[in-house]
Amino acid sequence: MKTKVFGIGFHKTATTSLAKALSYLGYRVTGPNWVDNPNIAEEVYEMAFELANRFDAFQDNPWPILYKELDRKFPSSKFILTLRASDEWIRSVVNHFSEKEMPMREWIYGVGHPKGNEDVYIARYERHNREVLEYFKDRSEQLLVLNITAGEGWTKLCPFLGEHIPSVGFPRANTASEREKLRKRESFWPRRMYITFRRRAKRLMTSSIAR
């Protein structure tokens, strides 16, 4: 049985890349796991502990907020704090979430969306990272700090987990360049369908006139 691994870095710190890496190593991964009820605290712990009994690895919301409770309930677990520079992080958060309100984010930050609330989000992000480091300061065998966006990957992750280093590259998922490619693909097909429709309509009109 795999040791439980909790990713406790905030979203937009390469949590999806971490999930793909853990999955490649054979872990059963879950997250993000959302609760849409505005009274989120009433449901999140029950949901999290139920999932914790079914999976090996966990990332994104709500796991970063629950690390103390998870440590007490699963004392032999390992924790991974993914992070990145605060200015890079907030740009990514704003680009991704903008003004979209979510109960989960309101529970974490006190306000439901980052746009216009950048200082609030950065303060919460930096406080979380400081508190995690303080909490695990005498237990380095249980906490790995990993900056995937700066190029860290298998060579830090695998020794920490006691896994062999794979010969494949470390996964890089949900990057800005990937999202831009997806946006272009999604915008390409409506244009293509419109052009095809116009051409067919023009041929039909020409055919009708010829008759």
Short names for language-model regions:
Residues 13, 65, 87-88, 152:
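Short alpha-helical
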Residues 23-27, 43-45, 49-52, 68-149, 154-159, 163:
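PAPS-dependent sulfotransferase catalytic domain
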Residues 30, 78-80, 144-146:
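Hydrophobic/aromatic beta-strand patches that form the interior of the parallel beta-sheet core
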Residues 33-43, 86, 134-138, 142-196, ...:
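The conserved 3'-phosphoadenosine-5'-phosphosulfate
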